[in-house]
Design a protein with these regions (language model features):
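Glycine/small-residue-rich phosphate/adenosyl-binding loop
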Residues: 59-129
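A glycine-rich helix N-cap at a beta->alpha junction
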Residues: 85-93, 164-186
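Small-aliphatic-rich amphipathic alpha-helix that forms the alpha element of a beta-alpha
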Residues: 27, 46-52, 93, 116-162, ...
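C-terminal helix-cap and adjacent tail motif
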Residues: 22-35, 107-109, 174-267
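N-terminal capping/interface segment
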Residues: 14-62, 74
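Single conserved hydrophobic/aromatic residue that forms the stacking wall/gate
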Residues: 1-15
Length: 267
């Protein structure tokens, strides 16, 4: 009986590993959603999965602001450049680094908090993003689609105002979640050699850089983008169109100002 039980357990483990590998390998960002709401028990599973993510000192230095009301999603939409998915998706989750809650607890226990500085902003960001990714994996396990919104840091001050964030709390990303209304192709990725280093950092040669990006640069999607943008190569699409120097500097200045306002620069 014990042997049968052990064999059954091994089969279950193998099936679980295969399912997890398949789930992670088929991830795609979804930008079109049906209006169907997320079942409360599914949302609860997602949030519980988020709460089990690794966290600095078991402090859970994050807050997940779950917005489902149409009114608030419409208020947030301009912060995300009015992308339709913000109002299409039934659930918008703003992920924040949060030292406010832990600091309050310390103060109420006669323990002086010391988390209003840049080091603890970084710890909060790490906690927040780990929780966010756990949430996304759980959502996809339920057959839902997700998309991270990088626009969060562009308009973080307005998001903080709309969501009434106190000092010690700052938005770091946003996730839209819902039932997919599209099935896009998988996007390409750089080969593992591009991102994995053995023992020490590998310093790339020019020819290695060419090789790592060769597949991306010769893809049909890249050819289409080059034609649309009238640019000679993929790198210039990033530097001249998508993420321009002047925009990057403006976003950085604005976010640094909000960090100071929210009390993260007492260094």
């Amino acid at each position: 009986t014990q042997g049968v039980s052990s064999a059954a357990s091994d089969v279950y483990k193998r099936q679980l590993i295969i399912r997890m590998k398949t789930l992670l390998a088929k991830h795609r960002s979804i930008r079109k959603f049906r209006s169907e709401p997320i079942a409360p028990e599914v949302l609860q599973d997602m949030l519980e999965a988020a709460s089990r993510a690794s966290t600095c000192g078991n402090m859970q230095l994050y807050s997940l602001i779950v917005t489902q009301s149409r009114e608030l999603r419409e208020a947030l939409a301009p912060c995300h450049f009015n992308q339709p998915m913000v109002t299409q998706a039934p659930c918008v989750i703003t992920v924040c680094a949060d030292v406010h809650r832990f600091s309050m607890w310390c103060e109420q226990r006669d323990a002086e908090p010391c988390y209003d500085n840049f080091a603890w902003f970084l710890n909060g960001v790490t906690d927040a993003l780990l929780a966010a990714q756990n949430l996304c994996v759980e959502a996809e396990a339920h057959g839902l689609g997700i998309c991270y919104l990088g626009t969060t840091i562009y308009t973080a001050e307005e998001i903080a105002r709309i969501l009434d964030l106190p000092k010690g709390v700052i938005p770091v990303t946003t996730i839209v979640v819902g039932h997919p209304d599209e099935s896009p192709e998988l996007t390409d990725r750089l080969p593992l050699d591009a991102v994995v280093h053995c023992e020490k950092y590998h310093h790339y040669t020019s020819s290695e850089i060419d090789e790592l990006w060769a597949e991306k640069e010769t893809s049909e999607e890249t050819r289409r983008l080059l034609e649309e943008n009238g640019l000679p190569n993929l790198a210039q699409i990033f530097t001249r169109n998508r993420y321009r120097a002047e925009d990057n500097l403006a976003i950085s200045r604005n976010y640094f100002a909000l960090l100071k306002k929210q009390g993260f620069f007492n260094n």
